């Protein structure tokens, strides 16, 4: 019996971690106009990786109503706001699914000390609202985000993320 439970747990974990969110997050980063400091190639690659991971984490947290995916990708105000969103969803029984995410990101400010980068993200995706797992609403959305990322020990973290009407 315990072997069956173990196999089921592994299959469930595998399906949750491979559920479409990660593969559906596409990010294009243009850092050519960042100032006053230019973004080094390796830094650009790491920011691209970590920003994609952040959106994968948002999608998983809001779809499965769990705070775990927010660890490591977010800090400060951004983590607090996302945690409140997940907690609110847990109370209401609703969840959100982000499908076919496409992010066109432009680095506009990179601090001379290299301790903060400002990104402008035009995000496009299908937003699905679910009630107890049942789809109740779906719409195609385009949202503009201003994002501040700061370096941590081994990655860049989203410190602030705010939707704005336009850049």
Regions flagged by a language model, labelled:
Residues 47-48, 94-97, 113, 134-137:
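Intrinsically disordered, low-complexity segments enriched in polar/charged residues with Gly/Pro
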Residues 1-5, 48, 149:
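Intrinsically disordered, low-complexity regions enriched in Ser/Pro/Gly/Gln/His and often acidic
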Residues 1-33, 163-165:
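Amphipathic, hydrophobic N-terminal targeting peptides for secretion and organelle import
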Residues 20-76:
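Short, low-complexity N-terminal intrinsically disordered segments enriched in polar/charged residues
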Residues 38-41, 67-114:
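Short solvent-exposed beta->alpha transition segments
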Residues 112-167:
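Exposed beta-sheet edge and beta->alpha loop/turn motif
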Residues 3-4, 51-53, 139-141:
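Short hydrophobic/aromatic segments of transmembrane alpha-helices and their interfaces
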Residues 55, 78, 125-127:
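Residue-level detector of secondary-structure transition/capping positions
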């Amino acid at each position: 019996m315990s072997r069956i439970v173990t196999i089921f747990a592994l299959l469930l974990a595998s399906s949750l971690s491979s559920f479409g969110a990660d593969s559906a997050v596409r990010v294009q980063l243009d850092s050519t106009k960042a100032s006053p400091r230019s973004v080094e190639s390796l830094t650009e690659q790491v920011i691209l990786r970590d920003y994609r991971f952040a959106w994968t984490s948002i999608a998983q947290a809001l779809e499965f109503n769990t705070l775990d995916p927010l660890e490591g990708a977010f800090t400060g105000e951004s983590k607090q706001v996302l945690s409140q969103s997940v907690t609110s969803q847990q109370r209401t029984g609703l969840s959100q699914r982000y499908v076919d995410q496409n992010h066109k990101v432009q680095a506009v400010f990179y601090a001379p000390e290299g301790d903060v980068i400002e990104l402008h993200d035009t995000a496009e995706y299908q937003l699905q609202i679910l009630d107890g797992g049942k789809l109740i609403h779906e719409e195609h959305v385009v949202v503009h985000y201003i994002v501040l990322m700061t370096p941590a020990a081994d990655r860049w973290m989203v410190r602030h993320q705010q939707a704005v009407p336009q850049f």
